[in-house]
C-alpha cells in the first residue's frame, strides 16, 4: 500500500563518508601480514520505507526524512605464513537504524530489520607449485538480525539466531582450463519456518 502515491519519491537520498587504515607488518617474515580497519557511515536524507510493521495485514511504502543511518565497521587480517598458503580473516559489525511511522501518528526509531548485526569469516587457501592444485576452505558466522513483527506491535519483535556456514573447494588447472569441485553449506544449516503460516496462504499471518 502506498498512502501518498502521487507524492511518493522512489529515489533515496543519502551521503556516505568513511575511511580506511592499513598496516603491513611481519609475523614470520617481513611484510607477510596485513591488518586493515574500515569505517563507513551512510546518512539517509530521504528513505524509501517498506514498512512491514505498520499493521498486521499490510506492507506500507512511504518516504521518510527522519533519522536513518548505517554505520559499518570492518577489520581485515591477511597472512601468508609460508609460500602459497594464504590465511584471511574478517569481522564486520553493522549498526543500522531507521525511523518508521506508527498508526497513531507518532514515529519510532528501530533497528533496521533483516540486517545481520555482525558477520565474521575465515578463509584458508593453499596452492601447489604453479597453482596446478588449489585447496580452499571457508568458515563464516552470521550474527542475529531483527525480524519484523507480524502483529504491528513493536514489542513483539524477535531476532534470528546466529548461524555458521562452511564451504570447501578444490580446483585443478589443466592447460588453459580450470576444473572445480566443491561443496557449499557443508553443515547443512537450514532456516526454521522460512514461510510463516505456509499452510494458510490467504491469512493475514502469511509471510
Enumerate the language-model features and the residues they cover.
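Outer-membrane beta-barrel translocator domains and adjoining extracellular loop/strand segments
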Residues: 1-3, 46-56, 94, 98-107, ...
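Outer-membrane beta-barrel domain signature
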Residues: 6-10, 61-66, 76, 107-113, ...
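Membrane-embedded beta-barrel scaffold of Gram-negative outer-membrane proteins
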Residues: 10-63, 69, 190
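Short coil turns and loop connectors of transmembrane beta-barrels in diderm outer membranes
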Residues: 27-31, 45, 83, 129-132, ...
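Gram-negative outer-membrane beta-barrel transporters
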Residues: 34-43, 63-150
Amino acid at each position: 500500500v502506498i498512502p501518498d502515491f502521487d507524492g511518493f519519491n522512489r529515489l533515496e537520498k543519502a551521503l556516505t563518508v568513511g575511511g580506511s587504515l592499513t598496516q603491513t607488518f611481519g609475523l614470520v617474515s617481513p611484510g607477510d601480514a596485513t591488518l586493515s580497519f574500515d569505517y563507513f557511515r551512510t546518512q539517509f536524507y530521504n528513505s524509501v520505507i517498506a514498512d512491514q510493521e505498520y499493521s498486521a495485514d499490510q506492507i506500507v511504502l512511504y518516504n521518510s526524512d527522519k533519522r536513518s543511518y548505517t554505520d559499518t565497521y570492518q577489520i581485515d587480517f591477511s597472512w601468508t605464513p609460508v609460500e602459497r598458503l594464504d590465511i584471511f580473516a574478517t569481522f564486520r559489525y553493522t549498526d543500522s537504524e531507521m525511523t518508521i511511522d506508527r498508526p497513531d501518528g507518532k514515529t519510532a526509531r528501530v533497528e533496521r530489520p533483516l540486517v545481520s548485526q555482525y558477520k565474521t569469516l575465515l578463509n584458508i587457501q593453499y596452492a601447489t607449485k604453479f597453482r596446478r592444485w588449489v585447496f580452499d576452505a571457508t568458515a563464516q558466522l552470521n550474527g542475529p538480525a531483527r525480524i519484523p513483527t507480524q502483529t504491528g506491535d513493536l514489542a513483539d519483535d524477535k531476532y534470528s539466531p546466529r548461524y555458521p556456514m562452511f564451504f570447501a573447494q578444490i580446483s585443478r588447472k589443466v592447460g588453459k582450463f580450470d576444473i572445480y569441485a566443491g561443496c557449499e553449506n557443508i553443515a547443512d544449516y537450514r532456516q526454521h519456518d522460512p514461510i510463516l503460516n505456509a499452510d494458510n496462504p490467504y491469512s493475514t499471518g502469511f509471510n
